[in-house]
Structures are given as C-alpha cells and as structure tokens.
C-alpha cells in the first residue's frame, strides 16, 4: 500500500475514519486513493449522526456505514423488522429512528447535480438522499438536514479540500469530470484465498503452479518413451486414427424408448389463477384451485384409454378430492393407496434359521435372476419435445431467482446488464416452465418427506409465473400467477440413506390424447371438458376441448429430490458458457463487444432437411438451457457412461480440426463402450444420434478420422 495516501489521510482525518478506510481498501482491493475518499465519507456520516437524540432521549441516528458488510446487512434487516419497514435491496449509510427512514450520504466535487441524479435513479424515494458538494451545494430529495449538521459538514469538506489542494492531491484523488472513469482491478484477500484453493493437486498455491508452468519445457523424446512404456505395459498396439477411422455409432433397434421424466412436459395442461401472497403455501394453493376453479367436478370415466389398474387410480382420485375438501391433505391407508404406493410390496428377506431348526435347501436360497432392461430405439417424439422446450411459453418469470445486489462500480453494472439480457431470453421458455415446476413441486415433496414420513400426503404439481405484457393497452396485468398442472400423492417416505426411494403417484391434466409409444407408463382417462382461450383476429374466444387425466406410479430418491429442487443451477452453467464466449471476444478486440457477439456470433443447434441450423448466440442460449435441464432430469448411469466416453471422440475431432495427429489403443473398443451405454435412456439415444450427425458433417468438410457407413 502506498504510504503517501495513508500519511495524508492521517493528518486531517480522525484515526477511526483512517482505520475504516484502510480496512475497506484492503478487503475489496480498491485503489489506494480510495483511502481518503472512504475516510472523508465515513467522517461526514459520523458528523451527520453525532450528538443528536430522539424525543425519548435515545440516539436518534444509527450509523450503518463503516461496518463489515455482513454486520451491516444484519443490522439493516433488524431495523426493517423492528420498525415494520420493507427490506431494501441495497445498503444505506444511516437510519433515522425518529422519522423511521434510511439515509444515504453522497459527496461529490462535480459542479452539477449529475451525481445526485444517478443516485436518485438507483434509489428513488425509498430513502433520504443528501449529496454534499465541496463548493457548498446540497442536493436532496426531502426536507433536511438540520442547519447545524449542514454547517459542520460543509466546514469539514472545505477544510479537507483546502488541505488536499495544498498537498497537490485533490486531482489525484478525483478524476477530472471530462475524463472517463478508469476501472482498476486489484486482487483482494478473498480473491487470493479462493485462487489458491482452486489450484489442482499436487500444487498448494497459485504461485507454485505458475512457477512450474513457466519453467516447464516439453521433451518430445521423454514423452515418446513414456508412450512406449505405456504401450509395453498394456500390450496393445498404438493405432493412428488416420488408418483406423471411427465408424458411426450403432443405435439399438426395437420398440421406441418411452417417456421417463417424472412429470409431463409438452402434453401438460395448466389451470391458472392470480397469486394471493397471503395464501402461498402448496396446500392453500391446491384448496383455492379446487374451490374457485371447481376442479372437484373432474371425474375420470370408468374405462381408461390405455394403461393398468384403472380401479385403483379412480378410487385414489376420489380420496384426493376428499382430502382436499376436509383440508387435511392426508389420505388414509387402504387397499388402493397401499397398492399404488408400494406399501407392503417390497421383496422379503430370507428368514434367519436357528441352529436347532432344519437347514433350508440350496434351492430355497437362490435369488431370482436380474433381468436386463430391454434395448429401445431412438424415440421420434424426443425431437419434437426438444424443439418445444426451446420455444417461448405464454407466460414468463417461471424460475424463482434472487434479486441482483446493488452495483458498486461500473464493472458490476456491466455484468448485471449482461445477466439480465440472458435471463430475459431464458425465463419465458417452455424449458423454464418445467424447471419452475420441478423446483416448487419437488421442494414441497421434500418438505412432506421430512415432516410426515409415515403419512400419505397430497401435494400440488404447480409453478409460479408472470404474465407477458397484454396485447391490448390499458388492460390490468397481474403481477404473479399460480399454475396448477396436476396433483401428486406422496407415499410413506422413510429416507434413511441418500439413495433411499419413495413412491409418488401423479395425476396430471392434459388436452392431448396419449401417444401409445411415448406414454407406455401412463394410465389415461377421459375426465370431462375444459375451455381453451384462443385468439381469433383481435378478439379472444373460448372453445371446449376434452380434458384427460394422466395417471402414473413412479419413484423419487433423496438425491433426485436434491437435483430437481435445485434445477435453477442450469441457468448458471448456461449463462456462464455464453458469458465466457462474449468476454473472450471482447478481450481479443479490447472493447465492449457483448451485444455484437450475442447478436452476430452463430452456434450450431441441429440439423434439418440435411442442412445445419445455426442461430445467434442470444437465441442459442435456449438450446444450452434445454441441454442442461435434460441432463438433470434424465441423468443415470447410462448417461454418465456415455458422456464420459464420447468426449474421447470429440477430442479426436478437435485434433483433426487443428490438423494434429490423434491415436489410441483400441478405437473399436471405445465405440463398443459407448454402445453399451445405449439401452433405453432417451437423452443418451438423442446425443448418440447427434454425435453421428456431427461426424457425418465433419467428414463432408474433410475430417480424416471418421468414415461414413
């Protein structure tokens, strides 16, 4: 740290102000000139607060500025709670107990009110704003402050300005108004600590790893000897891919793979209502839908369109309506709920035999043979559902996200703008709808599993969203909507281990007839009619359509609960991928090219009629999100094995692209390993087909390592 700034600060600032400023600069890695700026601001805040009492004799002002960020946030939240105020999304400097308002203090050397206007644009009238200038001007959005406060503060600022001018430091601390602000980056303590923690083993610190990498020199002879040694140990000949080309992956044949996600996606139909903040619990939402929407009138017909156990599902549906009507959300144990919930149907262990009893025969100890899953072919329905997930839904704001913290500098403003741009594209997609459904529904199931493990409970399959802007101006737009997709019954759930399973029975609404190949696992009933709103010209008309009830018994594990309830993480991976591309392009050009990159850079998203389809990065975001979410919902051992092996082919493809030689020990064995993972997972089969298409396209463009059958 430069001693010049610290020494000057110590000559005219209070010791406490200097200490606070030094700690802030060291913690956040700011420029040394900030010592004087922060110190002056803190001392002005102290002058604003000191020696002023409320009518009851206690201190009128509470000083928030100068505390550690965590402590300051806690204090501000406590004050909001104590005085029944709305929590603020940003930190203020002071709290006025007498007027029950927060106060923001600003200090500027500008001759106009631009600094005040920028603060007012961010904060509005949510708090008092006082901006003091070195030339004696005060900009504010309310009455005050007291005359004595103003005199003390202006006197101090004038003294500070004179002192800094004598030391020729006034212009050093503040950049001239006609120059652009320079963003100077410095590594703070937290950054350095996280950087050292992230280095791979065997390195202990970043500097150690950096030193090793800088001194490392590749030795071709040494590398060749290591390869030869590895070859002699494995006793397999090295095969260069130019002579031993990769063939296409053979997809399994047979019936199409069925739909295996826990909830319907493209076929799902939802009932909507305006959200009531006072009735936001899952059970209350379900009661309101059945009461106001008359959903109790839904009655499945006796004969299903397809599926097994229709009597059990019909009786359980009647029990669900009774549980909602009496507001208990609990279903009593009976033959139907126990059968569908799998209660008492677990395989029994072989009984222990005491020494005094006869020994049981070897035949009695034999375990039934495990049946391997039947191989399934690529499902035609998957492509249609993939494209549906990419498109926009009627509503937006499906995934609940935390509010952005207040930006403290231009770099954070820039990052916030980029994230809001990407989030605006993603939040209105059908994929975001399904993510929101998983987050809230599985979150409610997790709560019921923890609180009522021994009970059979009713939980809504629901999500929350916001309406898009009305097509006709002047119509009121509800801020938030509750969307009900169906009802889920949780069976008994004693989850002692992470892989512990529990049964759920889902009843989901749809206005589409079932696809026998896709919905093999469902029992489907006709259940009456519903009204669909359709836009015809400038008016909206209602049309009655049949309503179907899709019923299914499936299971969830403790681990799957965690994955689905945290599906919003798919946003992070997606946005991080695109952000990296944008920042890399900007770094190359040494200018802000974010908007240009989002709108002009193309990404391959698929193939149609034998030709590649590419879209701008802004729209390709959707494909990235769908891919991440599908990894989340279809994840199993097949998908993990496939992804682990396919990357070796992709590495060879990248090497071919860079005109480098690639080799391995057993290319045919690698393909066989991949094909072992292709059984009945729809996502695996989809990715294998995409990989084949990628290989075909690469071969057309001159790739040397692949051959087309």
Swiss-Prot record:
Its EC number is 3.1.-.-. Phosphorylated on serines and threonines by host kinases, including human casein kinase II. Disulfide bonds: none annotated. Mn(2+) 2 binds at residues 65, 93. Its cofactor is Mn(2+). Belongs to the influenza viruses PA family. Influenza RNA polymerase is composed of three subunits: PB1, PB2 and PA. Interacts (via C-terminus) with PB1 (via N-terminus). The keyword Hydrolase applies. A motif (Nuclear localization signal 2 (NLS2)) lies at residues 166-228. Plays an essential role in viral RNA transcription and replication by forming the heterotrimeric polymerase complex together with PB1 and PB2 subunits. The complex transcribes viral mRNAs by using a unique mechanism called cap-snatching. It consists in the hijacking and cleavage of host capped pre-mRNAs. These short capped RNAs are then used as primers for viral mRNAs. The PB2 subunit is responsible for the binding of the 5' cap of cellular pre-mRNAs which are subsequently cleaved after 10-13 nucleotides by the PA subunit that carries the endonuclease activity. The lineage of its organism: Viruses, Riboviria, Orthornavirae, Negarnaviricota, Polyploviricotina. This is Polymerase acidic protein. It comes from Influenza C virus (strain C/JJ/1950). It is found in: Host cytoplasm; Host nucleus. One of its GO terms (molecular function) is endonuclease activity. Pfam families: Flu_PA. InterPro entries: INFV_PA, PA/PA-X, PA/PA-X_sf. A motif (Nuclear localization signal 1 (NLS1)) lies at residues 109-124. It is an enzyme of class 3 (hydrolase). GO terms for biological process: cap snatching; DNA-templated transcription; symbiont-mediated suppression of host gene expression; symbiont-mediated suppression of host mRNA transcription via inhibition of RNA polymerase II activity; viral RNA genome replication; viral translational frameshifting. Binds 2 manganese ions per subunit. GO terms for cellular component: host cell cytoplasm; host cell nucleus.
């Amino acid at each position: 740290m430069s001693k010049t700034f610290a020494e000057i600060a110590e000559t005219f600032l209070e010791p406490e102000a200097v200490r606070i400023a030094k700690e802030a600069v060291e913690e956040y890695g700011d420029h040394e000139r900030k010592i004087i700026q922060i110190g002056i601001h803190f001392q002005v805040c102290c002058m604003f607060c000191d020696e002023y009492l409320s009518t009851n004799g206690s201190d009128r002002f509470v000083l928030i500025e100068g505390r550690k960020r965590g402590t300051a946030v806690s204090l501000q939240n406590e004050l909001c709670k104590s005085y029944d105020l709305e929590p603020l999304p940003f930190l203020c400097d002071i709290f006025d107990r007498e007027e029950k308002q927060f106060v923001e203090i600003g200090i500027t050397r500008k001759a106009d009110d631009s600094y005040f206007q920028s603060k007012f644009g961010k904060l509005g009238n949510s708090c008092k704003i006082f901006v003091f200038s070195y030339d004696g001007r005060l900009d504010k959005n309310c009455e005050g402050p007291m005359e004595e406060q103003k005199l003390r503060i202006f006197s101090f600022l004038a003294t500070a300005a004179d002192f800094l001018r004598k030391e020729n430091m006034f212009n050093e601390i503040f950049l001239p108004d006609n120059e652009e602000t320079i963003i100077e980056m410095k590594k703070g303590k937290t950054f350095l600590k996280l950087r050292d923690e992230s280095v791979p083993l065997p390195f202990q610190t970043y500097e150690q790893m950096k030193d090793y990498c800088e001194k490392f020199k590749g030795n071709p002879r040494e590398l060749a000897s290591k390869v030869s040694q590895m070859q002699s140990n494995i006793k397999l000949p090295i095969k260069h891919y130019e002579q031993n080309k990769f063939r296409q992956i053979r997809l399994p044949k047979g019936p199409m793979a069925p739909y295996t996600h826990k909830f319907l996606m493209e076929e799902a139909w939802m009932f909507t209502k305006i959200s009531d903040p006072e009735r936001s619990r899952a059970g209350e939402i379900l009661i309101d839908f059945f009461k106001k929407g008359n959903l109790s009138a839904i009655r499945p017909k006796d004969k299903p369109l397809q599926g097994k156990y229709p009597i059990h599902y019909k009786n359980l549906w009647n029990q669900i309506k009774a549980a909602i009507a009496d507001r208990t959300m609990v279903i009593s144990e009976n033959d139907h709920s126990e059968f569908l919930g799998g209660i008492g149907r677990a395989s029994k262990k072989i009984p222990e035999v005491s020494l005094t009893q006869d020994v049981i025969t070897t035949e009695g100890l034999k375990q039934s043979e495990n049946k391997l899953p039947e191989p399934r072919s690529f499902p035609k329905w998957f492509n249609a559902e993939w494209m549906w997930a990419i498109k926009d839904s009627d509503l937006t704001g499906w995934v609940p996200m935390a509010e952005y913290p207040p930006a403290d500098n231009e770099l954070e403003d820039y990052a916030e703008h980029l994230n809001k741009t990407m989030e605006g594209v993603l939040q209105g997609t059908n994929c975001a709808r399904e993510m929101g459904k998983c987050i809230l529904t599985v979150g409610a199931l997790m709560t019921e599993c923890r609180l009522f493990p021994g009970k059979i409970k009713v939980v809504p399959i629901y999500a929350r969203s916001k309406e898009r802007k009305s097509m006709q101006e002047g119509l009121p737009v509800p801020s938030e909507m509750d969307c009900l997709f169906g009802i889920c019954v949780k069976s008994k759930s004693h989850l002692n281990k992470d892989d512990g399973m529990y049964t759920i029975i889902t009843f989901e609404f749809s206005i589409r007839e079932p696809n026998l190949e896709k919905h093999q696992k469902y029992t489907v009933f006709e259940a009456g009619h519903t009204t669909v709103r359709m836009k015809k010209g400038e008016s909206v008309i209602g049309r009655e359509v049949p309503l179907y009830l899709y019923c299914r018994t499936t299971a969830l594990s403790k681990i799957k609960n965690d994955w689905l309830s945290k599906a919003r993480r798919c946003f992070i991976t997606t946005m991080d991928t695109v952000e990296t591309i944008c920042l890399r392009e900007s770094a190359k050009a040494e200018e802000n090219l974010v908007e240009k990159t989002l709108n002009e850079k193309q990404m391959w998203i698929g193939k149609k009629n034998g030709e590649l389809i590419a879209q701008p990065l802004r729209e390709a975001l959707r494909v990235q999100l769908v891919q991440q979410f599908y990894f989340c919902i279809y994840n199993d051992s097949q998908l993990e094995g496939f992804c682990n092996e396919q990357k070796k082919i992709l590495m060879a493809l990248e090497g071919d692209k860079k005109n480098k030689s690639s080799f391995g020990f057993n290319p045919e064995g690698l393909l066989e390993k991949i094909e072992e993972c292709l059984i009945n997972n729809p996502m695996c089969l989809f990715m294998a087909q995409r990989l084949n298409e990628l290989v075909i396209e690469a071969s057309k463009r001159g790739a040397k390592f692949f051959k087309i059958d």
